[in-house]
Amino acid sequence: MATRLLCCVVLCLLGEELIDARVTQTPRHKVTEMGQEVTMRCQPILGHNTVFWYRQTMMQGLELLAYFRNRAPLDDSGMPKDRFSAEMPDATLATLKIQPSEPRDSAVYFCASGL
């Protein structure tokens, strides 16, 4: 009986380790000089095929910059295209670049993923 219980606990813990249900965004914090390039990376939840990039400035609500489904850009109308670019080269990575950075780019940038 004790062996069967131990076996169940180990399998449950292993199963929990295999499911990593979170979006990873790097860097977590970035302070840069004006004019520098900033690259943000997003690793979506495994199995999610849609990635969203949002920005929230001090005086505004959350605004959608761009989103991708199956690596293809579906809407990037919220992104200033003169200095911003976004891409999703594969199913495990999306990037948002700002070049050159300006003081008005100071904001919190969010990445989210979905099905």
Curated annotation (Swiss-Prot):
Keywords: Adaptive immunity, Cell membrane, Disulfide bond, Immunity, Immunoglobulin domain, Membrane, Receptor, Signal, T cell receptor
Disulfide pattern: C42-C111
Function: V region of the variable domain of T cell receptor (TR) beta chain that participates in the antigen recognition. Alpha-beta T cell receptors are antigen specific receptors which are essential to the immune response and are present on the cell surface of T lymphocytes. Recognize peptide-major histocompatibility (MH) (pMH) complexes that are displayed by antigen presenting cells (APC), a prerequisite for efficient T cell adaptive immunity against pathogens.
Annotated compartments: Cell membrane
Pfam assignment, any one: V-set
Quaternary structure annotation from Swiss-Prot or TrEMBL: Alpha-beta TR is a heterodimer composed of an alpha and beta chain; disulfide-linked. The alpha-beta TR is associated with the transmembrane signaling CD3 coreceptor proteins to form the TR-CD3 (TcR or TCR). The assembly of alpha-beta TR heterodimers with CD3 occurs in the endoplasmic reticulum where a single alpha-beta TR heterodimer associates with one CD3D-CD3E heterodimer, one CD3G-CD3E heterodimer and one CD247 homodimer forming a stable octameric structure. CD3D-CD3E and CD3G-CD3E heterodimers preferentially associate with TR alpha and TR beta chains, respectively.
Name of the featured protein: T cell receptor beta variable 12-5
Transmembrane stretches, start-end: none
Organism for this UniProt entry: Homo sapiens
Ig-like domain: residues covered: 22-115
Main location, first listed in the record: membrane
Gene3D superfamilies with a match to the protein in the record: Immunoglobulins
Residues of the signal peptide: 1-21
GO-annotated biological processes: adaptive immune response; cell surface receptor signaling pathway
GO terms for cellular component: plasma membrane; T cell receptor complex
